[in-house]
């Protein structure tokens, strides 16, 4: 029986400084809204917002098929290279490691679609941190999505004690 039978959502914030990674993630099976979003996202680029396949290396896309999209406008070539280089590699490796480790069942990988929203700060400079943090945040997002975490009861319980690092009163 399939483990991932519906669209699931994951989120994670990892790292610090301008290289912080904040991932918003959707995973779902063939025939689901995740597949539709994947196809639409791949062909509907807008100025400053570009979607791209997550590839481990050129000619080696990760499986499940994974589409990355930027969450803030890409303003210059440096920021584009960070998205198409360290962030892309980190995301792709996280997806493939999730398959290798059984988080995503290998027998389902060819029939799933993953969409990953990536944040690249306009002043990010350390490519190694960008790659590392995006890897960690993507993998954590996948784990949370596949496991249906956090549960509504946990969010409700922690809603007043949790702190948001960018909130007005942080």
Swiss-Prot record:
It is found in: Cytoplasm. Inhibited by the addition of an excess of H4F. Pathway: One-carbon metabolism; formaldehyde degradation; formate from formaldehyde (H(4)MPT route): step 1/5. The active site is at 22 (proton donor). One of its GO terms (cellular component) is cytoplasm. The keyword Lipoprotein does not apply. One of its GO terms (biological process) is formaldehyde catabolic process. Transmembrane segments: none annotated. It catalyses: 5,6,7,8-tetrahydromethanopterin + formaldehyde = 5,10-methylenetetrahydromethanopterin + H2O. Optimum pH is 7-7.5. It is an enzyme of class 4 (lyase). One of its GO terms (molecular function) is carbon-nitrogen lyase activity. The keyword Phosphoprotein does not apply. Substrate binds at residues 24, 53, 71, 73, 88. Disruption phenotype: Cells lacking this gene are unable to grow on methanol but exhibit wild-type growth on succinate. In addition, mutant is shown to be formaldehyde sensitive. NCBIfam families: one_C_fae (TIGR03126). This is 5,6,7,8-tetrahydromethanopterin hydro-lyase. It comes from Methylorubrum extorquens (strain ATCC 14718 / DSM 1338 / JCM 2805 / NCIMB 9133 / AM1) (Methylobacterium extorquens). The lineage of its organism: Bacteria, Pseudomonadati, Pseudomonadota, Alphaproteobacteria, Hyphomicrobiales.
């Amino acid at each position: 029986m399939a483990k991932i039978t519906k669209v699931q959502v994951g989120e994670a914030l990892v790292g610090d400084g301008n290289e912080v990674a904040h991932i918003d993630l959707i995973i779902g099976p063939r025939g689901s809204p995740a597949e539709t979003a994947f196809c639409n996202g791949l062909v509907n680029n807008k100025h400053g917002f570009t979607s791209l396949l997550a590839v481990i290396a050129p000619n080696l896309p990760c499986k499940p098929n994974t589409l990355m999209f930027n969450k803030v406008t890409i303003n210059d070539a440096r920021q584009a290279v960070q998205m198409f280089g360290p962030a892309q590699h980190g995301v792709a490796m996280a997806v493939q490691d999730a398959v290798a480790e059984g988080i995503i069942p290998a027998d389902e990988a060819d029939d799933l679609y993953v969409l990953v929203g990536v944040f690249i700060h306009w002043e990010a400079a350390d490519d190694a941190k960008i790659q590392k943090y995006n890897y960690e945040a993507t993998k954590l997002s996948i784990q949370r999505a596949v496991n249906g975490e956090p549960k509504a009861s946990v969010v409700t319980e922690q809603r007043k004690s949790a702190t948001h690092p960018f909130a007005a009163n942080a």
